[in-house]
Amino acid sequence: MNINTLIINFNKVKRMKNFLILTLLVVMVVVFLQGPTLMINNSGQGMGHNVEKIKLEPHVKIQRENLERKKIPPKQDFTDGLHASFTTIPFYYKANGIINQNTNKLYRNYQITIVTQTTVDRLSKVSMMAEKWKAPLSVAVFIKDSENPKAEIEKLEKHIENDYPALSYYSDIHILISNKTRYPVNNLRNLAIEHSRTDLVFIMDADFLPPLGLHDYILSQKYYFNIKPSNQHYFKNNLLNFYHKKPLNNNDNNNDYNNNPSKIPYDQIIDYSTNINTDSEFNNINYNMENLNENEYLKNINNNNNNNDNNYNNNNNNNNNNNNNNNNNNNNNNNNNNNNNNNNNNNNNNNNNNNNIDNNIDNKIDNIDNNIDNNNNIDNINNNNNINNIDNNNSNYNDNNNNNNNNNNNNNNNNNNNNNNNNNNNNNNNNNNNNNNNNNNNNNNNNNNNNNNNNNEPLKVAFVIPSFSSHIPPSQHPNNKMDMIDLVKSSKIEPSNSRVCKKCHSPTNFEKWMDAVEPYEVEYKWIFEPYLVFNKTQNIPFDERLKGYGFDKNSHAFSMAVEGFHFVVLPDSFIIHVNHSPSTWEGPSLDEQQWDALRVVCEIIPDVKIKNGYNPNVVLFNEPLPNECFSDHHW
């Protein structure tokens, strides 16, 4: 064997050694990487805690993100504004076209007020809203210059008197002066709601426009606010069969929540203010109002309002006379029946009293049926006629409602008269019989009163007005559902926030809305932020801790859901957001303001639950629990 052969063999051994070492390293790496998985797969129940740990990794990730985010303190303007108070001037300007200045009452049968808030430089948008709405508005205007508010208020007066006739005609203007905070959106909303001239309020933002005739269409559906357990079966096709969440028991342990350390102060703040760029069409509005001369249009409205008022008053007087005649006839009949009862024995008297009660109950049921029949007639009218031709129908509906209320009152009076007459007539019987009859009457009255208190309280209902957005000019916005659907199908109009926050409006169920002909209830889910019509006497105020950008409508809708509101979508209604170039903001970025607002929301959610008897650590509407709230994973 020569030297060359030895060298070749040595190199082969060396290469083999290197190959073996490399192979060993690869095997070690594979075993290291696959080891935990193999252990879990082979260990069964014995490694269950490891499996659980892996499943909880996203949850742990959220908690870590929460902790990291919470370490970032809010800006100083947030904390400084938490306890700020504001100077307000309600009714700084009163609507000059729809209000009788002598009586301070509405001329026409307006029953719904748009409630909105704005700044002086965005009044043109609210004026266009008034031109389309043609009904009362309650507008809270934010005066940004707290050191020299007079100059900005003078500018406001000039705009109202000279530039925006529709705004001055329909709008009550309330002023809120800045206190160097972020934009106090919910303070402004509450100011406008408090001073609205009607109990029914429609929450709107200044960038939205309604179609013509929306006020009267909503008014035609007003009977949904009178749904009670006694007549709820008439609406079985419109309402969901909600199960009632179980309230918090006194024995439930809330220590986990009550021991949460961090409670932020009560108020918070933001600034929509300044340098908002608006589209040219908003700033150059055609005020001819449906191609009519403005003065001629307002004159026609006044004449129509006066005629409507006179007709409405005459109808009311006639109804009162009819009711009085009916009452007299009923009283005579009751007296005759009572006289006949005197000849009967004690058992017959009791039977007659029971029959009277049964008749009264039947009368009340008949009145409910009449209400429903009248309302169905209105539905037929709406389906056959244009949305703008409902004024007379609304008046008839309101008269019918008044008649029904009067009938109910008359029936109640007749009940009392029957009882009194029975008591007087029964004096001819012996003392024992009188006592028995009186006791029976009193017991029956008490039972009826208890039933009325338990059964006749209306459900809490809020109308959802479907919200859309578009880049098309406001002059091309549709005024009826058919045209609206065509524009949606052509992608010129789309549901609000469909690309950035699907959860914000998806509960509206836009696909169902396209085909719907009757109102339908939708199930609330966090983080729904609908534009709502509701009765302000049933509702809690907007939370004024929320100032600035973020969660102001979402949190309020959640509070309404917890308080038991039913959200009913009106099928022929819609509003359209007028998309415009991005606005510039003073102060923190929108992202920072949103995270600051979330600090408040994470208190609102459990607080509202506790207030209404629910466990704050139990999910009701897909909302985040306290330990997961400060995160963007739920929105």
From Swiss-Prot:
Predominant localisation class: membrane
Asked whether the UniProt record includes Transmembrane among its keywords, one would answer: yes
Signal peptide location in the record?
A: none
Q: Which UniProt keywords apply?
A: Glycoprotein, Membrane, Signal-anchor, Transmembrane, Transmembrane helix
Q: Where in the cell is it found?
A: Membrane
Q: List the glycosylation sites.
A: 41, 179, 393, 535
Q: What is the recorded membrane topology of this protein? A: Single-pass type II membrane protein
UniProt key word Glycoprotein: yes
| Compositional bias per record (Low complexity), positions renumbered to this chain | 389-456
State which ranges are Extracellular (membrane side): 39-635
- Domain of life (superkingdom): Eukaryota
Q: Which residues form a coiled coil?
A: none
GO terms, molecular function = glucuronosyltransferase activity; xylosyltransferase activity
Membrane-spanning residues: 19-38
Family per record: Belongs to the glycosyltransferase 8 family. Highly divergent.
Record's Pfam families?
Glyco_transf_49
What protein am I looking at?
Glycosyltransferase-like protein gnt13
Cystine crosslinks: none
Chain intervals for the UniProt region annotation (Disordered): 300-358, 389-458
